[in-house]
From Swiss-Prot:
Domain of life: Bacteria
Enzyme class: transferase
UniProt-annotated binding residues for substrate: L134, A135, S136, G137, G138, D167, G180, N280
One CC-aspect GO term: cytoplasm
Cofactor binding remark: Binds 1 Fe(2+) ion per subunit.
Protein name: tRNA N6-adenosine threonylcarbamoyltransferase
Nucleus as UniProt keyword: no
Primary location recorded for the protein, binned into one broad class: cytoplasm
Function recorded in the entry: Required for the formation of a threonylcarbamoyl group on adenosine at position 37 (t(6)A37) in tRNAs that read codons beginning with adenine. Is involved in the transfer of the threonylcarbamoyl moiety of threonylcarbamoyl-AMP (TC-AMP) to the N6 group of A37, together with TsaE and TsaB. TsaD likely plays a direct catalytic role in this reaction.
GO biological process: tRNA threonylcarbamoyladenosine modification
Length: 344
């Protein structure tokens, strides 16, 4: 049986996973660093890298035990090799390449964004091509996923990523880190129409997005408010989340038009939302409704596979393993690595 070992360390989650050729996840271990970074209100790259170094060996032992797998049973080792916080990326990549060398097993360098992009093929086995909205703390872009290693970016944020906007607004409201889940929780208790926030470049006619102005508008409101109590916090969270939904819904329409200009895929019309923001149930509901209007089905992974994980890295490794797309051990990890620059 083919077994793929996946390693993820691009940000603040140390993750190791083993999957089979049948897309079965045998084990998926994630060691979170949230408590280590919470006091700083965000991820500290140096702390993240050092934590990966101390957690990886433990995570590997746990995943082998949980999956009842020996290291010698592993067919290939896939590891995030960019983009991301370069210290953590180097730690994970070096760990994987050391294992590869010692075990004499192939190594596969995985683009972290490709891991997110292919998650829906792991969970739902959808065919190529499909439209992807990649929404996380570090990225926000619409991508035409045409095949393995064949990606066309249709539009992206021109400033902040949507996940970053969630985290920054949460910090303004003195909510816990990470901020996305806290905003969603507070929004359920608030009035989404209490405050009207701007929707930057919503009528631009292209697939690009902007969230910096929205973030600034929230900050300005908070500064000018005389009192900030729980009711106000809930209303701001709800109004902010509502505005994000409006922006993304509008841009999904633009992305569908752009996607249909470059594909002939009119039988199985799928839109995938991936990345940490895909875990937001309000956005899932809003975007599902928008997709349905245009005859598309919105697919989003289970919550534990929306955020950073190694199962998605292992699956991307499986697709590349099946196509014999291996990576030399002298591969240089990358802090920046566009989906369009992936080479097969």
């Amino acid at each position: 049986m083919i077994k793929i070992l996946g390693i993820e360390s691009s940000c603040d989650d140390t993750a190791v996973s083993i999957i089979t050729e049948n897309r079965e996840i045998l084990s998926n271990i994630i060691i979170s660093q949230n408590t280590e970074h919470a006091v700083f209100g965000g991820v500290v790259p140096e702390i993240a890298a050092r934590s990966h170094l101390s957690h990886l060996d433990k995570a590997l032992k746990n995943v082998l035990k949980e999956s009842n797998t020996k290291l010698t049973d592993i067919s290939t080792i896939a590891a995030t090799s960019g983009p991301g916080l370069i210290g953590g990326v180097i730690v994970g990549s070096m760990f994987a390449r050391s294992l590869s060398s010692a075990l004499k097993k192939p190594f596969i360098a995985i683009n972290h964004l490709e891991g997110h992009a292919l998650t829906a093929r792991l969970t739902d086995n959808i065919p190529y091509p499909y439209l992807l909205l990649l929404a996380s703390g570090g990225h926000c872009q619409f991508v035409a996923v045409l095949g393995l290693g064949k990606y066309k970016i249709l539009g992206s944020t021109i400033d902040d990523a949507v996940g970053e906007a969630f985290d920054k607004v949460a910090k303004m409201l003195n909510l816990a880190f990470p901020g996305g889940p806290e905003i969603e929780k507070r929004a359920k208790l608030g009035d989404p129409h209490k405050y009207k926030f701007p929707k930057p470049i919503i009528n631009s006619g292209n697939c690009n997005m902007s969230f910096s102005g929205l973030k600034t508008a929230v900050r300005t409101l908070i500064i000018n408010l005389k009192e900030i109590n729980d009711t106000v916090i809930n209303d701001i969270a709800a109004s902010f989340q509502f505005t994000i939904g409006e922006i993304l819904s509008s841009k999904v329409q633009d992305a569908i038009r752009a996607y249909e200009q470059i594909t002939n895929n009119f039988d199985k019309k799928n839109i995938v939302i991936a990345g940490g923001v895909a875990a937001n149930k309000y956005l899932q509901k809003i975007l599902s409704s928008c997709a349905k209007t245009y005859g598309y089905r919105l697919i989003y992974p289970p919550i534990h596979l929306c955020t950073d994980n190694a199962a998605m890295i292992a699956y991307a490794g499986l697709e590349r393993y099946n196509n014999k797309l291996f990576t030399p051990l002298n591969f240089c990890p990358k802090a920046r690595w566009s989906l369009e620059d992936i080479s097969n």
